[in-house]
Amino acid sequence: MYARRKYDLKKILYVDIDAHHGDGVFYEFEHDPDLIIADIHEDGSFLYPGTGFESETGSGAAKGTKLNLPLSPGATDRDFISAFTKIEDFIESMKFELIIFQCGADGLSGDPLTHLKYSDKSHEYAAQVLHRIAHEKSGGRIIGLGGGGYNTENLATAWNKVVEVFASENLT
């Protein structure tokens, strides 16, 4: 991984809130204990790629360093925030030097390809929590990456919220 080589980092936290399970990242790093993965997505029983079940927690030395939180179709901000608190609990005792936040916006209500019903408040909440955690645990190092989102208005609104939070000095 580029960030490891370039900046001599050992442990990285990757948080993915795209509606689709991040199967490419998950399965590439399934055996890697130095990439902690937390992924909230629509249940794979209802949405492509059909992966990301709670029982998938990593393998070998990486067992327990991966967290999949599939949500039922129709999940709202309340469901998202409840799941996100599980991420907070999951990473509480872990050490990492960088957070990578994949902030796909296809979980927002009105997306034509998914069945989740979040508002931009979910993105804002996730960004606030990760921003605070980055300053507490990884020297403020956090990267926000775009992801899926097939309603352009939702996409712009959600990503704007993330940028606003990351640019602020408020760590609530």
In which residue ranges do the predicted regions lie?
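Rossmann-like dinucleotide/flavin-binding elements
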Residues: 144
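C-terminal active-site-proximal or functional interface alpha/beta core segments in diverse enzymes
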Residues: 150-172
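Conserved alpha-helical scaffold segments that buttress catalytic/binding sites
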Residues: 1-136, 163-167
